[in-house]
């Protein structure tokens, strides 16, 4: 049985027309084939998704940067122990690339999908592809973020708001009052960490000032934080401390401040 199941039902040797029709009826009922009037009988799309491949697709925003090598290695270790293989893809935090990855994976035989959504704070415009995963009963789980309209789907998240709160609280407990924040605007993690930052300030009786927050996006993440740190020094308005979205941004900001002669942690 390949693309066209049978050109003529009698082409199956030594089987009656009745037997062939009955067999095709059972296959169609079970979803293995589709019959088209006047065209023939074909393998169903469902055949590609029987889920016995022992392949798990893993889609992350990046592969070689930051925390991702260890993250992927951890998943591979666990899956390998259970006899599964990884199909690895990355999106570079691009919605278009995420959609292409899903389209490609829907053409493959996979048993499940682990995916980090791209720009998770924005509306998902390719939700139909996730609906196809549901249609073919391919299980999937979101990691590190989730689209707001898909919160009913399985997901594993850090408590980003609590993380932002604890970091800000730490600086406040050291006696710092003027605390700037550098946060990512197009990922859910950035907004949640910002919420924690605001909560800590408010609990300490410090009014939240939007001007104390630098927002950046995926496209300018390697430029804007350093640029804004430089402008901050040039303005002569140094804060007591800075809360950064993650370690990468913290290092970028620190390096720029040190270039400008700012001592860390003495001055900031």
What are these model-predicted stretches?
Residues 34, 39-46:
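Minor-groove-contacting beta-hairpin "wing" of winged helix-turn-helix DNA-binding domains
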Residues 1-7, 11-12:
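Single conserved hydrophobic/aromatic residue that forms the stacking wall/gate
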Residues 38, 91, 118, 145-146, ...:
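Short, ordered loop/turn segments at secondary-structure junctions
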Residues 30, 77-85, 100, 104-111, ...:
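Bacterial carbohydrate/catabolite-sensing allosteric modules
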